[in-house]
Regions:
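Selective recognition of hydrophobic, aromatic-rich stretches within alpha-helical transmembrane segments
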Residues: 73-105, 148-175, 210-234
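A hydrophobic membrane-anchoring feature enriched in long, contiguous, low-charge segments
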Residues: 7, 11, 63, 67-70, ...
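Interfacial aromatic "cap" segments that immediately flank transmembrane helices
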Residues: 14-32, 115-142, 167-205
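Membrane-interface segments at transmembrane-helix boundaries
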Residues: 4-8, 54-66, 90-127, 169-188, ...
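Lipid-exposed faces of alpha-helical membrane segments in multi-pass integral membrane proteins
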Residues: 32-37, 74, 78, 135, ...
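Long hydrophobic alpha-helical segments typical of transmembrane helices together
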Residues: 187-247
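Long, highly hydrophobic alpha-helical transmembrane signal-anchor segments
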Residues: 40-81, 118-142
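Hydrophobic alpha-helical transmembrane segments of multi-pass membrane transport/permease proteins
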Residues: 26-46
Length: 247
């Protein structure tokens, strides 16, 4: 029940934030960039990418067996998915490096004014961390490619990998700004399952047409609310504990 309550509070806070016009600016910047990249790649790269996929196994085997139409269709679908994924990664990178700090500063002042910035992060470390996590995500994606041909895995693996990407990128960067080392450790231990589930739910959004372009900004906003709500709860419990001990 606690897990679903935390997710419900996060959803409610996220929807409430959408009434703020400035929030939409933070959502649209990565969306427009991702859309621009997506359209360019679809126009100039989809054909060439599909041809290369046709020349590589297992599609090349399908062509050799005479299933040319099916191979072409699968090549186009695979190319479209790859381009959409790349556009999402670019949007996520821009969001995590440039938009998230501004978003945190804004909602920190407007909705979490009582929370103190207790972290010690700086812009350079955030940028390097985001690039490192995306590199690991791509590496995991490549290493698990053979599993995609196992029935059902092609649907499950992309969601799990993106859930991990969302969790690692946003949770750690938000905690780096607001939380002390002890607070980071406690929140990551106590809320891991909820945060991963949040990443999984938002990875579904990232795989939906059109909505996928808004996914980086929406994901950053939702994770910001979850982590800050968890931190607020943690600090409230700590204050209450001190007051009880003093009595």
């Amino acid at each position: 029940m606690i897990l679903f309550n935390n997710l419900f509070l996060t959803l409610r806070a996220t929807l409430k934030s959408l009434a703020d016009g400035k929030i939409w600016f933070y959502l649209f910047v990565p969306t427009l960039l991702a859309l621009f990249v997506w359209v360019l790649l679809l126009i100039f790269s989809l054909g060439a990418l599909s041809e290369k996929l046709m020349d590589a196994p297992p599609l090349s085997l399908m062509v050799a067996w005479g299933m040319i139409s099916l191979a072409k269709m699968l090549a186009l679908i695979s190319g479209w998915i790859s381009i959409t994924g790349l556009s999402y990664l670019i949007g996520l990178l821009v969001t995590s490096i440039f938009i998230l700090p501004l978003l945190l500063k804004h909602i920190g002042k407007t909705q979490y004014a009582d929370l103190v910035f207790a972290g010690n992060s700086f812009w350079g470390s955030t940028a390097l961390y985001s690039c490192w996590v995306i590199f690991l995500y791509v590496l995991l994606w490549v290493l698990t490619l053979p599993l995609w041909f196992v029935p059902g895995f092609a649907l499950i693996l992309p969601l799990i990998l993106m859930a991990w990407l969302n969790y690692k990128t946003y949770t750690f960067e938000i905690l780096a700004d607001f939380a002390t080392s002890a607070e980071k450790k406690e929140i990551l231990q106590k809320h891991f399952l909820s945060l991963f589930l949040l990443g999984l739910l938002l990875s579904l959004v990232a795989h939906l047409p059109i909505l996928c372009l808004f996914a980086p900004g929406i994901t950053a906003l939702a994770f910001s609310h979850y982590v800050l709500l968890a931190l607020k709860e943690l600090r409230g419990d700590a204050i209450l504990s001190v007051e009880v001990q003093n009595k």
